[in-house]
Swiss-Prot record:
Its main location: plastid. InterPro entries: Ribosomal_uS19, Ribosomal_uS19_bac-type, Ribosomal_uS19_CS, Ribosomal_uS19_SF. It is found in: Plastid, Chloroplast. It comes from Dioscorea elephantipes. Gene3D superfamilies: 30s Ribosomal Protein S19, Chain A. Protein S19 forms a complex with S13 that binds strongly to the 16S ribosomal RNA. GO terms for cellular component: chloroplast; mitochondrial small ribosomal subunit. GO terms for biological process: ribosomal small subunit assembly; translation. This is Small ribosomal subunit protein uS19c. NCBIfam families: rpsS_bact (TIGR01050). GO terms for molecular function: rRNA binding; structural constituent of ribosome. The lineage of its organism: Eukaryota, Viridiplantae, Streptophyta, Embryophyta, Tracheophyta. The keyword rRNA-binding applies. Belongs to the universal ribosomal protein uS19 family. Keywords: Chloroplast, Plastid, Ribonucleoprotein, Ribosomal protein, RNA-binding, rRNA-binding.
Length: 92
């Protein structure tokens, strides 16, 4: 289900505070966060946010096309481990 339009987009308070401070000082630095459920808002555009994927922080540069999506959509958590081929020729 999508979020109701009556409500504001969800952004963790400490993340929005960091972005507001950087925008006021007009600085660009990497913001580290574990909040994958926060929505990308227009104030985040132009910043690099390092999103935790369960193992490490994955840096993502926020563009205008990402506004409205969640941060976790751009930091994959699973890596596909391919099964070994059952190749009978290699066994001979």
């Amino acid at each position: 289900m999508t979020r109701s339009l009556k409500k504001n987009p969800f952004v963790v308070d400490h993340l929005s505070g960091k972005i507001e401070k950087l925008n006021m000082r007009e600085e660009k630095e990497i913001i580290v966060t574990w909040s994958r459920g926060s929505t990308i808002i227009p104030a985040m555009m132009g910043h690099t946010i390092a999103i935790h994927n369960g193992k490490e922080h994955f840096p993502i540069y926020i563009t205008d096309q990402m506004v409205g999506h969640k941060l976790g959509e751009f930091s994959p958590t699973l890596t596909f481990a391919r099964h070994t081929r059952n190749d009978n020729k290699s066994r001979r």
